[in-house]
Each structure stands twice: as C-alpha cells, then as structure tokens.
Amino acid sequence: MSEMTPREIVHELDAHIIGQQNAKRSVAVALRNRWRRMQLEPELRHEVTPKNILMIGPTGVGKTEIARRLAKLANAPFIKVEATKFTEVGYVGKEVEQIIRDLTDSAVKMTREQQMKKCRHRAEEMAEERILDALLPKPKDDWDTDQKDDSTTRQVFRKKLREGQLDDKEIEIDVAAPQVGVEIMAPPGMEEMTNQLQGLFQNLGQSTSKRKKLKIKDAYKQLVEDEAAKLVNQEDLKEQAIELVEQNGIVFLDEIDKICKRGESSGPDVSREGVQRDLLPLVEGCTVSTKHGMVKTDHILFIASGAFQMSKPSDLIPELQGRLPIRVELDALTAADFKRILTEPFASLTEQHVALMNTEGVTIEFTESGIERIAEAAWQVNERTENIGARRLHTVMEKLMEEISYDASEKSGSKFVIDAEYVNDHLDTLVQDEDLSRFIL
C-alpha cells in the first residue's frame, strides 16, 4: 500500500495532469486516509469507513486520467469500470457484483506477483539445479560413480551457465502445463455453482507437466517461474488477497451520469435506476461471493465520476447521493490550459510527435508561437462545436502532422519548424469553417 503523503501524490499527478487541483487534493487525501486507517487499533479501524468521492466535470478535463494515474500510485487493488456496462439483476448483462469479483482477481494477481518476487532467489537456485540435471543426467548405475568427479564437472558447468556460455544450447525439460480456462454462462444468482464447475473442469483437463525442447536461456526463465509458483502457498495467497481487497481496495466508477434517470419514462429502467439500486449495497457495505471466497465491501473506497451534461448529480437516487459525500467539481479547460498540456506533462503530445518523427530521421521543432496557435485552434473548435476538452488536441495535432507523417520516410534528414504561420496554413480553413470543424476536427 502506498505511504505517499497527500502533497507527494498531488506532485506525482501534476506530472501528468494540468490543473484540477481540487480533484487531485481530494483523491490524495482519500488515498492517504487508507494508510492512516491501517495505523489505528483494530477496534477503531473497523469503525472508520471511507468517504466516497463524486467527481463532476465536463468531458476531457482529466477525470479518467486521474483514475489511471491513481491506479499506478495506489499500490493497492484498483479497478476502473464504466457504470454503463452493467444492468439490473435478473436481466441480460453484467451485474454490479462483477466489479468486486474483478477487483478480487486483480488482488490475487497482485499478491501472487509479490510472493513470487519474495521467493525468486530460491526459485533461481532450484531452476539452476534442474538445468544442470538436464545437462548432466545421472547414470543408471550411479552406485559406483566417482562422486568427486561428478561434483567437479557440475561446478564447471554451473560456472559456464552463470557466465552465459551455455545460453544457446538446447535441452529438454518438463515445464508446468498452462491451465485451460472454461467459460460458463450461468443465470443470475448461480455464481457459486459456476465457480465450482469451472474448478472441476480445470482439474479434469489439467496435465501436470509438458516436455519441451528449449534453449537454456529460455528454459531458465520458464523454470524460475515454475519453481516460484510451486513455492507460493495458494490458500495463504487467497486469504491475503481477500484481506487486501477488503481493507485497501479502490473502485473507480466512470460515466456514472449515464445511469441517471432522464425525465418521465415508463417501463423498467434496467440499465439506469436499476443499476443505481444494485450499487447501493456495494457502496454501503455487503458480502459478495467470489471464486476465491467471500469479500466484504464495507471498507472499499468508491470514486465515481461523470460529466453530468445531460443530467445533474441530484438526478441520482437520494440513497446513492448520500453514499458519495465528497463532491469535487473539475473546471473546463481554457486555451492557456491547452498550451500547458502541450508542453508541461511527462511525454506531452509535442514530445511524442518529435520522438516519432525522429525514428524516420526527421527533425521537428515546435516554436512558442506554434504551440500557442495550436492551443487556440483547439479551444476555438471546442467553443464552436462540441466541447470534448483536451481530447480535441489529439485531433488537431493529428491533422497538423498528417502531411509530415505521410512524407517522413522519404524526407530523412529534413527539419520542419512548426510556428504560428505553419499552423495557420494547415488549420486555418478548418478552424474557421464550422461545418468542416464539425466533421474533420
């Protein structure tokens, strides 16, 4: 789990996301509170529940990007899902409980990787011994062999193996056969039976090992993975993963505004209000059955986000509003923000295009005036047509670089300076003509 302070988290987010300080501070505090809670006495810790967050802001201002970057910083089970993918229980489609099952799967994978990393040194030693056994098989009548000579030969080969002299030599080894997954579609409420059937089919079709002929360098990697997997206790692994999900799990619910009820409509609203009602117990705290065991959701942090252009937060059912107590509003982006987005973040758009053209031997230079004009053009198109936020910059940049990209392979050694004049020549007509902007940019 991440031990970063809120200030450090915001600093990391600043490297990728421009502006939106309120949203960054809220998620940073929420993430830090996960760590603070774990420092409390068990009795008090159980009573401290997470304060869920609702992020509100127009499309393309950084809501989803905050989630992506937070996932890397959290060092905890994290899942990002779109609320629109789910339907009410009893109808065709995914149930909201699948969110917790997917979160648990990611926690199991994360815990397995951590445990395999811990026992990697021991696994490397065992893999080395298995390769030496394949290179120097013991004779059948080994009762009369000279143990001293055998040990000396083994040490010579061990030295060669470690120095990489045997990397290209081929050997035959037994490696663990991959498990064949069986996907079973079952009606709602039958998940427990489905999990048991999947386990049964996996065990039936499971072959313990498979003989392969590999180069030693490839065989070594495969054997290290196999030996590390053998050293991991599967029961302990599942227990730790479930504990990790229950105490530190984070769910990011994107597009929550799309499941708001709009106006008066008759008939069942299976993918809107029905989904909201199904989300209530998850957010409030319930127990979900997964193939790894029962998972309690009482202390899982939920961060919801939505543009709320066609609806408003008050259109959510009151019970769900009450379970998202922290509201954060993200600001619409200005031309000045666009200029910063083009230059300041790590691996900014301009840096990416310069690096891509460098692979063809073409040098690209963006001047200050050129960057300002690109930002203005993107902002103008957003104002005149649909406002899609920073995503408009991708469209504008692709259109601007189209000609250079097409001819780059034939113009190795050339240099292009992208200034205000170049931008005007290539984009002015499209920006000024609203019909062209609507269809091309």
Curated annotation (Swiss-Prot):
| GO BP annotations listed | protein unfolding; proteolysis involved in protein catabolic process
* Compartments where found: Cytoplasm
Keyword Nucleotide-binding set for record: yes
Give the UniProt keywords, A-Z.
Answer: ATP-binding, Chaperone, Cytoplasm, Nucleotide-binding, Stress response
**Lineage: superkingdom:** Bacteria
User: GO MF terms on file?
Assistant: ATP binding; ATP hydrolysis activity; peptidase activity; proteasome-activating activity
The terms describing its cellular component in GO are: HslUV protease complex
User: Which family is this sequence assigned to?
Assistant: Belongs to the ClpX chaperone family. HslU subfamily.
- What quaternary structure, including any partners, is listed in this protein's UniProt entry? A double ring-shaped homohexamer of HslV is capped on each side by a ring-shaped HslU homohexamer. The assembly of the HslU/HslV complex is dependent on binding of ATP.
Q: Function of this protein?
A: ATPase subunit of a proteasome-like degradation complex; this subunit has chaperone activity. The binding of ATP and its subsequent hydrolysis by HslU are essential for unfolding of protein substrates subsequently hydrolyzed by HslV. HslU recognizes the N-terminal part of its protein substrates and unfolds these before they are guided to HslV for hydrolysis.
Give the protein name, as stated in the record: ATP-dependent protease ATPase subunit HslU
> Which organism's genome codes for this protein?
Shewanella frigidimarina (strain NCIMB 400)
